Design a protein with these regions (language model features):
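Alpha-helical interface subdomain recognition
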Residues: 1-102
């Protein structure tokens, strides 16, 4: 639910002013939150199922595929470090006018 609210807030800000000040950092915050949450959930899922969950033919479901897709998303969307740098750079540039603090 938190990510959905962040995405709606970003979309609203973008629709009101596509070249607005906080568009870049709001997008980075959404991406960072989604990447971190997905990684945590997939790691916990793999821990619950143990080594058996990582086999492709696991009878418990597609644990291996979801974990692999999560890692691919982590690389595709940009490492969380890049997102954190973007957020911190823009926070310093704009001062303390940010709505979100991670």
């Amino acid at each position: 639910h938190a990510l959905r609210c962040m995405v709606y807030d970003f979309a609203k800000a973008y629709m009101e002013n596509p070249t607005g000040e906080y568009i870049e950092e709001k997008a980075a915050m959404c991406k960072l939150f989604s990447i971190d949450t997905t990684r945590k959930v997939s790691d916990e899922m793999l821990e619950i199922f143990g080594g058996v969950g990582y086999f492709e033919d696991c009878k418990y479901g597609p644990v291996e595929r979801l974990y692999r897709d999560c890692r691919a998303m982590w690389l595709e969307e940009g490492a969380p470090t890049v997102q954190r740098i973007t957020i911190s750079r823009n926070t310093i540039k704009h001062g303390a006018h940010m709505e979100y603090v991670l």
